[in-house]
UniProtKB/Swiss-Prot annotation:
Organism: Streptomyces coelicolor (strain ATCC BAA-471 / A3(2) / M145)
Entry function: Catalyzes a Baeyer-Villiger oxidation reaction, i.e. the insertion of an oxygen atom into a carbon-carbon bond adjacent to a carbonyl, which converts ketones to esters or lactones using NADPH and/or NADH as an electron donor. Thus, can convert bicyclo[3.2.0]hept-2-en-6-one into the oxidative lactone products 2-oxabicyclo[3.3.0]oct-6-en-3-one and 3-oxabicyclo[3.3.0]oct-6-en-2-one. Is also able to catalyze the sulfoxidation of methyl phenyl sulfide (thioanisole).
Signal peptide range in chain numbering: none
Keywords for the protein's UniProt record, in alphabetical order: FAD, Flavoprotein, Monooxygenase, NADP, Oxidoreductase
Name under which the protein is recorded: Baeyer-Villiger monooxygenase
Binding site for NADP(+): 112-114, 248-254, 271-272, 386-387
InterPro entries to which the protein is assigned, alphabetical: FAD-binding_Monooxygenases, FAD/NAD-bd_sf, Flavin_mOase-like
Stretches assigned to coiled coil: none
PANTHER family registered for this protein in UniProt: FAD-BINDING MONOOXYGENASE AUSB-RELATED, L-ORNITHINE N(5)-MONOOXYGENASE-RELATED
Length: 603
């Protein structure tokens, strides 16, 4: 393995050139347009395989205090934090058949979370639950979302198998009208949107995809009726099948070992290899994590956030590969900025990055027996160009006689499909089943994309209000002209690799806003001046990431090779500082976000 001190200027120059060549092999002129949505003729890919037949019910026409759009962790946390604030009439609307969000939909074989369960699963202190595994399987995570909902009585008023189709502010009554695909039209004083950033599955736009006569499905709607087995494997229905899988990101890294165990033949179609580090999962006990202490989970979660944000701590409580590479993770977070010599920092960072990636590539050689296959599995890009993955099974799966790796980089993916299978280059691969592990339209909620129309004061659409100059918010949560609308997990806030922590802080803040508005008979709405000040704060310290992502291999981090824009898109000082800012705001400045309910004009 190459270490930092062995990386000469010549070696670094060679790496840069290799990274450039590998990037050029994969960049497509159509960018993000290469993907299809699961609608129109492809709508069957998004059908709910878990809910069964929807209950027949009459349309809902009543009124609640708060409508929460989305029943994933964001929505569950919003409901729970509202309950803690004493809000009684809370209704969650969720298109799935139960709580869980992405963990409701994704139940594919091998699914786990890559963040330690004791920091990823929220409200462990409040529910008294201690995770069974360091990295929890999907079923444990989904059941915890349900546990929170049960603990805080969210099942009392919930509309499952129901999608919100529009949110409209009534200027006359000062309420939101919530309409759904089941003809509901109820009213709410407040709306909290928690539609998530992993909710819209995507498919590869392969020419002829509709011609294939075999079986197909997306990993987020796994078809166990066809494959047999369950999340732990045992896919006996594939024993005599020729199976293909498209996608080798976080989902593919988990599902491919399970498919390899049970499929008659498995073809893995890979455009870009993931970086695959050690997982080292294990069962855990309450004693392992100090769960006998009050507040243990919050302490551990805060400790993890500080470590991956590059802050100094007395002890790294989680002590895993995320925290070990904390210095590199600063590139993933908007906290990266140095007041001193930026050029010197970048040079040192490049050396550390190269050493880390050399170690990851060396691990491929250690675990994959065929040199040609090993070479195709090596990630030739910088560490933060793609979300890292972790597995102790994935690379070894390619040593099996029934597994074939098909490199599609030079053809920019699968070239076409026909009735029999897929075509790459001059080779046709006949298949009985093709699994799409192609992920989601990451980072774009239904509200921001316009798929969920939101109309505020005077009927102005949120998307139209933001079309000219981009998003306008205070803290990423509230917007002028859209009173009593609180958006969780949105732009212009802070991000973290542990997304549930961010969602929980948003939920705590949103619930506090609702409680304060109720106590004062006010509406939650920032002034335009408050928005301007917040955007100026973001812009003043906005990090220059555009050059970095423009040089990365294509993926969802950089809009498939287009780079990411600079500007006020996220809080620049990191999630830990942002959470502290929200706490101070609640203590000192809450009244600045409250306006008299009688106000009907934007100020």
């Amino acid at each position: 393995m190459a270490h930092a001190q062995e990386l000469t200027p010549e070696a670094l120059a060679g790496l840069r050139e290799r990274y450039r060549r590998e990037r050029e092999r994969r960049v497509r002129p159509d960018g993000t347009r290469q993907y299809l949505g699961a609608d129109a003729e492809f709508g069957f890919y998004a059908a709910d395989p878990w809910a069964g037949e929807s209950d027949v019910r009459e349309p809902v026409r009543d009124r609640v205090d708060v409508a929460v759009v989305g029943g994933g962790f964001g929505g569950v946390l919003a409901g729970a934090r509202l309950r803690q604030q004493g809000v009684a009439r809370v209704r969650v609307v969720e298109k799935g058949g139960d709580f869980g969000g992405t963990w409701y939909w994704n139940r594919y074989p091998g699914i786990h979370c890559d963040i330690e369960a004791h920091v990823y699963l929220p409200m462990l202190d409040e529910t008294g639950y201690v995770p069974e595994w360091k990295y929890a399987p999907g079923e444990e995570i989904r059941r915890h979302a349900m546990r929170i909902a049960e603990t805080f009585d969210l099942y009392t008023d919930v509309l499952f198998s129901t999608a919100v189709t529009s949110l409209s502010w009534d200027d006359t009554t000062g309420e939101w009208i919530v309409e759904t695909d089941r003809h509901d039209a109820f009213r709410a004083t407040y709306v909290i949107t928690a539609t998530g950033v992993l909710s819209e599955l995507k498919l590869p736009g392969i020419p002829g995809i509709e011609r294939f006569k075999g079986h197909t499905f997306h990993t987020s709607r796994w078809d166990y009726a066809y494959t047999g087995g369950g999340p732990d494997g045992g896919l006996t229905g594939l024993a005599d099948k020729r199976v293909g899988v498209v996608g080798t990101g976080a989902t593919g890294v988990q599902v491919i070992p399970k498919l390899a165990e049970d499929a008659g033949q498995l073809h893995v179609f890979q455009r870009t290899p993931s970086s695959v580090d050690v997982r080292a999962n294990r069962r855990t006990t309450a004693r392992d994590v100090g769960a006998d202490r009050a507040g243990w989970a919050s302490e551990r979660r805060d400790n993890f956030l500080r470590v991956v944000s590059g802050e100094a701590v007395e002890e790294d409580l989680v002590a895993d590969r995320w925290t070990a590479t904390a210095g590199l993770l600063e590139k993933l977070l908007p906290s990266f900025r140095r007041p001193d010599d930026l050029a010197a920092f970048e040079a040192a960072y490049e050396v550390a990055d190269a050493a880390r990636m050399n170690d990851i590539r060396a691990r491929v050689d250690d675990l994959v027996t065929d040199p040609a296959t090993a070479d195709r599995l090596k990630p030739w890009y910088r560490y933060a160009c793609k979300r890292p993955t972790f597995s102790d099974l994935y690379l070894q799966a390619f040593n099996r006689d029934n597994v074939t790796l098909v490199d599609t980089a030079d053809t920019h993916g699968i070239e076409r499909m026909n009735e029999r299978g897929v075509v790459v280059g001059d080779t046709e691969y006949p298949l009985d089943c093709l699994v799409f592990a192609t992920g989601f339209s990451v980072g774009v909620s239904g509200v921001h994309s316009g798929r969920l129309p939101v109309r505020g004061r005077g009927g102005v659409r949120l998307r139209d209000a933001w079309s000219a100059r981009g998003p306008r918010t205070l803290h990423g949560l509230t917007s002028n002209g859209f009173p009593n609308l609180i958006q969780l997990g949105g732009v212009q806030s802070a991000s973290s690799v542990n997304h549930t922590h961010v969602l929980d802080e948003h939920a705590v803040h949103g619930a506090a806003l609702v409680a304060a508005a109720e106590a004062k008979g006010a509406v939650v709405e920032p002034t335009r001046e408050a928005e301007d000040a917040w955007i100026a704060t973001l812009a003043e310290h906005a990090p220059d990431h555009a050059w970095f992502h423009a040089e990365c291999t294509p993926g969802y981090y950089n809009a498939e090779g287009r780079g990411r824009p600079n500007g006020p898109t996220a809080y620049p000082h990191g999630a830990a500082a942002f959470h502290e800012l929200l706490r101070r705001w609640r203590e000192e400045s809450m009244d600045e976000l409250l306006a008299p309910r009688a106000r009907v004009r934007a100020c």
